[in-house]
Design a protein with these regions (language model features):
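Bacterial N-terminal signal peptides that target proteins for export
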Residues: 1-8
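Non-catalytic cell-wall polysaccharide-engagement segments
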Residues: 2, 19, 355
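Bacterial N-terminal signal peptides
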Residues: 9-18
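Sec-dependent signal peptide cleavage junction
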Residues: 18-31
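Intrinsically disordered, low-complexity tandem-repeat regions
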Residues: 29-30, 34, 39
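Active-site- and interface-proximal helix/loop "cap" or "latch" segments in soluble metabolic
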Residues: 39-169, 175-413
């Protein structure tokens, strides 16, 4: 009997212990539903757990020490992103030969790229009639002759993630279009005195994207271009989505309008045809009618260490309604002076998947906090800094660089 009593007490204690753990577990109130739900003990990390990533890397290694600002002109809209007078495709001072890099002439490619892209996306693909078309066969033969792999391929491919330097000011228009089952195309257009002075496109794949690393991440400066460059599909197109976006932007700035017959690059036409082009044409009416109360003020400052800092502010009727700060790494690895940061070339601190993985998204947290405080205070330079992690060297550096940019544009609206 005594033995049975001991067993009873033992099992009773087993039941009480988990009940006590649950009782000590903090409760989380769902403000929308008004219900109280339990939060798993493991899901609530301690401060030491949150900061554990800091012990895995030396944060001092992620700072550009002794960097110097490039001397630039701070007159608004002084720099031109493209050369409108050139017969060549000149974007941000670099000449692009998309006839050569696309693997086929644009004229022929425009006839076939949509079908070929569908095939490589694993969808139904082109009809047999189209595949048998002599011009299609000709285009594919040209493409095969230009096929490159390995380092030769990387050397042949070139895309830029650099924004225009200096200050840009004008009326602001933005749009978003969901296409192809969850992909999101974004467009921002700035117009000053009837001139389109700036346009920037970006794309975000759905959260169900087959490559989970890129699911829900923007593509322009995240490192997605390298993911595409490793794909067999680009062995002959030699073009990334970033090339395709830049080419569309060049056409808009060259034509000075949004509604016209766009040309697309071989290998990046799906996003253009189904996302960006329809979006830009939808925005054309709004731009033509000057139907906006928003103003854009942006500034990009290059540094000699291979990083450019960028601040973009959106005003609506004089009130700050949005802000974004970013730091963009150089297009060429050798231009980045800090060895630790070289691997992030053609990416930015805000968008880079790998940079944010290594630094625990600390830069994104900084930018989100910065945006929140600026919107609350309605000042680019006068706001509380308690929530900003200035004890981290790379964040302290970013904050100081931000203040320099903010000081340059705080009186411009």
């Amino acid at each position: 009997m005594r033995k049975q009593s001991k067993f009873f007490i033992f099992f009773l204690l087993l039941g009480v212990f988990p009940l006590q753990v649950n009782a000590d577990t903090p409760a989380k109130v769902d403000a929308k539903a008004g219900a109280t739900t339990k939060v798993d003990v493991v899901s609530t990390p301690t401060v030491s757990q949150v900061d554990k990533w800091k012990t895995l890397i030396n944060l001092e290694d992620y700072v550009c020490n002794n960097k110097k600002r490039e001397k630039i002109n701070y007159t608004p809209n002084y720099y031109k992103y493209i050369d409108k007078n050139s017969n060549e495709i000149v974007i941000n001072g670099r000449v692009y030969d998309y006839d050569a890099s696309s693997g086929a002439s644009r004229t022929v490619a425009d006839m076939v790229n949509h079908s070929q892209t569908l095939k490589y996306d694993g969808k139904k693909g082109a009809s047999k009639e189209l595949e048998a078309d002599p011009k299609v066969k000709e285009a594919m033969e040209l493409a095969k002759k230009k096929t490159k792999k390995g380092q030769e391929k990387i050397n042949a491919m070139y895309w830029s993630v650099q924004p225009p330097k200096g200050i840009i000011v004008g009326d602001y228009y933005s749009g978003k279009k969901v296409f192809d089952g969850g992909y999101e195309a974004y467009a921002e257009v700035v117009v000053n005195n009837n001139e389109i002075v700036h346009i920037e496109l970006n794309e975000r794949p759905p959260v169900t994207y087959y490559a989970s690393e890129w699911a829900g991440e923007t593509k322009r400066r995240s490192g997605y271009g390298f993911f595409q460059a490793k794909s067999p599909r680009t062995d002959y197109t030699l073009a990334t989505l970033i090339n395709g976006m830049s080419y569309l932007e060049w056409q808009v700035l060259k034509n000075q309008k949004l509604d016209f017959d766009y040309k697309t690059l071989f290998g990046s036409s799906n996003s253009a045809r189904n996302g960006f082009v329809p979006l830009l044409k939808e925005m054309a009416k709004e731009v033509n009618e000057k139907a906006t109360d928003k103003r854009y003020v942006g500034i990009t400052q290059p540094y000699d260490c291979g990083i450019s800092t960028r601040l973009e502010v959106i005003y609506e009727k004089g009130k700050i309604v949005d802000l974004k700060y970013d730091e963009i790494f150089a297009d060429d690895k050798e231009d980045i002076k800090n060895p630790t940061l070289k691997e992030f070339y053609r990416q930015s601190k805000l968008e880079s998947v790998e940079y944010n993985r290594i630094t625990n998204k600390s830069f994104r947290t900084f930018v989100n906090t910065l945006r929140r405080e600026v919107l609350r205070s309605q000042s680019l330079t006068e706001f509380p800094t308690d929530a900003i992690k200035l004890d981290m060297p790379h964040i302290k550096e970013a904050y100081e660089d931000y203040l320099f940019l903010a000081g340059k544009i705080k009186n411009i609206k």
